[in-house]
Design a protein with these regions (language model features):
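Transmembrane-helix bundle of Major Facilitator Superfamily
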Residues: 2-162
Length: 162
């Protein structure tokens, strides 16, 4: 039997993910966010060593960091808009995939320019991850717990940012 729905009846929608899925989603989103934020500062520690190993001046070597940060700033709003168009999950998963590939390239790089270009692309992938991160929280958490989700998100950024 088919029932019609009049304008006064509301169709119930799921409010956030059910509990086991919610935990996995929070861990996945949190881990990806942690890696993208952690990679902003991770090179700072080895900058003098990289400068020595690549035979570049410390001022030139800072472009390994600057390239990553500029890529994030340049593309953050674009990836956010792209998430609205094609879906947050697609942008997020593409960002994670590219982040893993560029991390491998960074680890295997044998020259200053290879590392710098890989870090720039890593910055674009980190931008894809972070641009849709907050938007995904409203699908993960029920409306009554969205503040908790934002708090956990902010805590992940604070801890991973040092």
């Amino acid at each position: 039997m088919v029932q019609s729905i009049n304008s006064t009846q509301k169709i119930e929608e799921t409010d956030g993910l059910p509990m086991p899925k919610r935990i996995w989603a929070v861990v996945s989103v949190g881990f990806a966010l942690c890696m993208s934020v952690l990679d902003i500062n991770i090179v700072n520690i080895v900058l003098p060593t990289l400068s020595h190993d690549f035979g570049t001046s410390p001022a030139v070597t800072t472009w390994i960091i600057n390239g990553y940060q500029l890529a994030i700033v340049i593309s953050l709003l674009s990836f956010s808009a792209l998430g609205e168009i094609i879906g947050y999950r697609k942008v997020f998963l593409s960002g994670i995939g590219l982040f893993c590939i560029t991390s491998l390239i960074c680890a295997l790089s044998d020259s200053f320019w290879t590392l710098t270009v890989a870090r720039i692309f890593q910055g674009f992938s980190a931008s894809a991850i972070t641009s849709v991160n907050t938007a995904q929280l409203r699908y993960i958490y029920p409306k009554s717990q969205i503040g908790r989700g934002m708090g956990i998100n902010a805590m992940v950024v604070a801890i991973s940012g040092g």
